[in-house]
Swiss-Prot record:
The protein's name in its UniProt record: ATP synthase subunit beta
Binding site for ATP: G152, G153, A154, G155, V156, G157, K158, T159
Native source organism of the sequence: Blochmanniella pennsylvanica (strain BPEN)
PROSITE patterns for the chain: ATPASE_ALPHA_BETA (PS00152)
Any single Gene Ontology cellular-component annotation: proton-transporting ATP synthase complex
Class in the EC hierarchy, top level: translocase
Compartment(s) where it occurs, according to its Swiss-Prot or TrEMBL record: Cell inner membrane
E.C. number: 7.1.2.2
Length: 462
């Protein structure tokens, strides 16, 4: 094995000198043993500086590193465990278990740096993935193998929506999921793990964490670690869900690494390679003739500004965008999805069918009209509206409340038992509200229920 020596350490960036004839290539993994801490640290080559010196990014804490330490070239990129042995386990960026449950005992390891599938291998199927969440299935349906973005500021419910989706896919569809925590809070990661155990779906999920306190190299590469595990499940013929929370932190880690490597930043301080880095990740998240990877990516929107370069770059890769609104959350309506801002390429009569398309379009137009009437109501009151507009306001308020739904993973917060609603029941319920079948039922009956039958039952108790 070829070895070199550390010549410079600046935070998470380490320069290593090798002989000219054995210089490692970019993305090669290097290993260094830190005697004072009795631990091994993995470095990833980011640049060749010339003269046999390579600049590396540390995949862990650099405490104890010093000049002169021997570094071994592993002659391959970072490799992580793949396969069913990873299910139910919590791992770090290197695929090492961090859940105190012993070694993973994997049969195979894959490199985290892989090429996207060839164009000829891609699947063109347009199958819908029913989530059991009314507002998503009706207004912005998911496709198998699609990329979905959950956009929202801090505290509007991105992680809770993800937890519910994992629970529904595991329980109702018996599917595998890979959850990647990129730069999120350790507390959230712990809560998420415990929720998966409580929902009895832990054995269908592989969890990969690179938390906020980790060095930027970890946070930049952890998404690729999770994606590699998902690719293995896909290639075995499974329809797998890949959850990334949060794609914004992935961009941020790239910004930090870029600055550490001395690259010139672009707009708002982001790295000049933002589009390329995002493209490398997103192009690998795709479906082939063997199986599908459907990805749900939480996207933190800085200061609720959707034009920020990070969310704006993510937008271009997505098939569906779900915008979580602070105004809707303030009304106590959860999930706080904004049906007017959210959209999906799948909402097409040729894919979802004419009835579904018509109901979704009617719901949107009623809610849009209510939005326009709000100013008039605020100034002049309801009495000044025409009879037709009064009816629209009445129905839109019922629709708005019927879009709320009790989640299984949020039972402890809401006090309501979670419900999974079939697509047929969702379409039927909204269709009947639009037709005026329930104009006599007060709007309170539509809040936090599943199907329209539950509305009728709740109305009897009011």
């Amino acid at each position: 094995m070829s070895s070199g020596k550390i010549v410079q350490v600046i935070g998470a960036v380490v320069d290593v000198a090798f002989n000219q004839d054995v210089v490692p290539t970019v993305y090669h993994a290097l290993e260094v043993h830190i005697d004072s801490f009795n631990k091994k640290l993995i470095l990833e080559v980011a640049q060749q500086l010339g003269g046999g010196i390579v600049r590396c990014i540390a995949m862990g804490n650099t405490d104890g590193l010093r000049r002169g330490l021997v570094v071994i070239n592993l002659k391959h990129s970072i490799e992580v465990p793949v396969g069913k042995e990873t299910l139910g386990r919590v791992m770090n960026v290197l695929g090492e278990p961090i859940d105190m449950k012993g070694p993973i005992k994997e049969k195979e390891k894959w490199s985290i740096h892989r090429s996207a599938p060839l164009y000829s291998e891609l699947s063109t199927d347009q199958d819908l993935l029913v989530t059991g969440i009314k507002v998503i299935d009706l207004m912005c349906p998911f496709s198998k193998g699609g990329k979905i973005g959950l956009f929202g500021g801090a505290g509007v419910g991105k992680t809770v929506n993800m937890m519910e989706l994992i629970r529904n896919i595991a329980v109702e569809h018996s599917g595998y999921s890979v959850f990647v925590g990129v730069g999120e809070r350790t507390r959230e990661g712990n809560d998420f793990y415990n929720e998966m155990i409580n929902s009895d779906v832990i054995n269908k999920v592989a969890l990969v964490y690179g938390q906020m306190n980790e060095p930027p190299g970890n946070r930049l590469r952890v998404a690729l670690t999770g994606l590699t595990m998902a690719e293995k499940f896909r290639d075995e013929g499974h329809d797998v869900l890949l959850f990334i929370d949060n794609i914004y932190r992935y961009t941020l880690a790239g910004t930090e690494v870029s600055a550490l490597l001395g690259r010139i930043p672009s707009a708002v301080g982001y790295q000049s390679t933002l589009s390329e880095e995002m493209g490398i990740l997103q192009e690998r998240i795709t479906s082939t003739s063997l199986g599908s990877i459907t990805s749900v990516q939480a996207v933190y929107v800085p200061a609720d500004d959707l034009t920020d370069p990070s969310p704006a770059t993510t937008f271009s890769h997505l098939d569906a965008t779900i915008v979580l609104s602070r105004q809707i959350a303030a009304l106590g309506i959860y999930p706080s999805v904004d049906p007017l801002d959210s959209n999906s390429q799948q909402l097409n009569p040729l894919i979802v069918g004419q009835e579904h398309y018509n109901v979704a379009r009617d719901v949107k137009s009623i809610l849009q009209r209510y939005q326009e009437l709000k100013d008039i109501i605020a100034i002049l009151g309801m009495d000044e509206l025409s009879e037709e507009d009064k009816l629209i306001v009445l129905r839109s308020r019922k629709i708005q409340r019927f879009l709320s739904q009790p989640f299984f993973v949020a039972e402890v917060f809401t006090g309501f038992s979670g419900v999974y609603v079939s697509l047929r029941d969702t379409i039927q319920g909204f269709k009947e509200i639009i037709e005026g079948k329930y104009d006599h039922i007060p709007e309170q009956a539509f809040y936090m229920v599943g199907t329209i039958e539950e509305v009728i039952k709740k109305n009897k108790t009011l």
